[in-house]
Regions:
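Conserved structural scaffold segments of CAZyme catalytic domains across common CAZy folds
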Residues: 1-108
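Aromatic- and carboxylate-enriched substrate-binding clefts and catalytic-loop regions
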Residues: 68-186
Length: 186
């Protein structure tokens, strides 16, 4: 598809072309998809998570997000995104985060919880973490440091997003993902 215009602004006026070249939404029940504002929790502690939930309620935010470090050092192949194992560089208190307690607290206050997971863990554990995160009450996953642009990685990304949709988990892509219109379908 080639888009042409007399003025650059006219391209933006017709930026729905790529979106509309994709099939319509294939998700039968989209009620779980709730766009909103999210704020990152940086202390990786139960207290910090609850405090951020309270902040989110007061500021009309819809989600909190636990970033890198909640399942270990994200660049270590041994890090396991099925466990809450804090990266000691981020928080030396190994048992400082009771994620299930924070998720329950957030749910009581109408706030969703999202988790950061980098591509290394996503590639190795995606099929394992999706049902687990669903059972934990997680609202979505922030894909981190994913490869973007090539056909191979775009296909991988689309398949991963489809799998997340099967479990009712929203996806936030951390990196410079190039829109392909796939968001119309999933």
């Amino acid at each position: 598809v080639i888009m042409c215009a007399d003025k650059p602004g006219e391209i933006l006026e017709h930026n729905d072309i790529l979106l509309n070249l994709n099939p319509p939404c294939r998700i039968k029940d989209t009620s779980w998809i709730k766009p909103g504002k999210v704020m990152r929790e940086v202390t990786l502690t139960t207290e910090g998570g609850k405090a951020l939930v309270d902040f989110a309620v007061k500021r009309n935010l819809q989600y909190i997000h636990f970033d890198a470090g909640w399942y270990g050092f994200e660049y270590d192949k041994a890090s396991d995104a099925t466990t809450v194992t804090l990266d000691p560089r981020r928080n030396p208190k190994i048992d400082a985060l009771n994620l299930k307690e924070v998720v329950a607290y957030a749910k009581q206050h109408g706030i969703g919880v999202m988790l950061y997971v980098n591509q290394r863990a996503l590639q190795q554990q995606l099929d394992e973490i999706l049902p687990l995160y669903k059972s934990w009450g997680i609202s979505g996953i922030k894909f981190g440091f994913v490869q973007v642009g090539s056909q191979v990685w775009t296909k991988w990304m689309h398949e991963a997003v489809k799998k997340c949709a099967d479990y009712g988990l929203m996806v936030d892509i951390h990196d410079e993902y190039r829109p392909t219109g796939f968001s119309r379908t999933y």
